[in-house]
Amino acid sequence: MRILLTNDDGIHAEGLAALERIARTLSDDVWIVAPETDQSGLAHSLSLSEPLRLRKISDKHFALRGTPTDCVIMGIRQVMDIKPDLVLSGVNSGSNVADDVTYSGTIAGAIEGTMQGVRSFALSQAYLYEDGARIVPWEVCETHAPALLEKLMVLDLPEGTFLNLNFPNCRPGEVDGAEVTMQGKLAFNLQVDARSDGRGFPYYWLKFGERAGAFIEGTDIHALKHNKISVTPLKLDLTDYSVTDRVARALGYGAQV
């Protein structure tokens, strides 16, 4: 089995090294095409205004000056001579749950793999933020991901569907199994931090305030809170079929779809 790895934290990220170790428990044909620098929060964006610079680090290991989406496209269409059987994106430093999925470059790696017709999974590891530092328990995903992936790889997923896996912030032995979940809802409470440079010109940072949400049973955020691995099926089709008829009636048309 041939596996392509990517991420959004960059080629030197600890989570990518963890993902490679995970992938090598499944196959000895593992390829990496990952961003040269941190691409967090760039979602499913393409580089259309700048050239893509590809750097070979070692056999089957490449860094690309581009987004996670660029990396998957280049991996499948340029770097690899044979299409991969599986795309794994991650392991992200921090969970990708609830509304995170709309911003996440990690999720985008799995989205692009799916669009390229390859079975794809996104993996993220929740962490503790303490005294201004991230404490990421990588051993959780490394312990539990291999067996989980072996089970999920044989699934007959519908076309356009991929899986979003999130591992809880706890010790490996404290993980209370895996749960199939739905996407939850979190308020980001994004804030704008206004500053001035040395010449008095303004510049800004976006930052997260305290995040709040309803930890409803069955959601990804509820699963993580209860030390469960969250497995959420996501799909490329963003159509809200529940309101198509109402929109059609508002426009004076008959029932649609």
Curated annotation (Swiss-Prot):
Annotated compartments: Cytoplasm
InterPro entries: SurE, SurE-like_Pase/nucleotidase, SurE-like_sf
Residues engaged in binding a divalent metal cation: 8-9, 40, 92
Entry's transmembrane regions: none
One GO MF term: 3'-nucleotidase activity
Required co-factors: a divalent metal cation
Protein family per UniProt: Belongs to the SurE nucleotidase family.
Protein name: 5'-nucleotidase SurE
Species in which this protein is naturally found: Rhizobium leguminosarum bv. trifolii (strain WSM2304)
Lineage: Bacteria, Pseudomonadati, Pseudomonadota, Alphaproteobacteria, Hyphomicrobiales
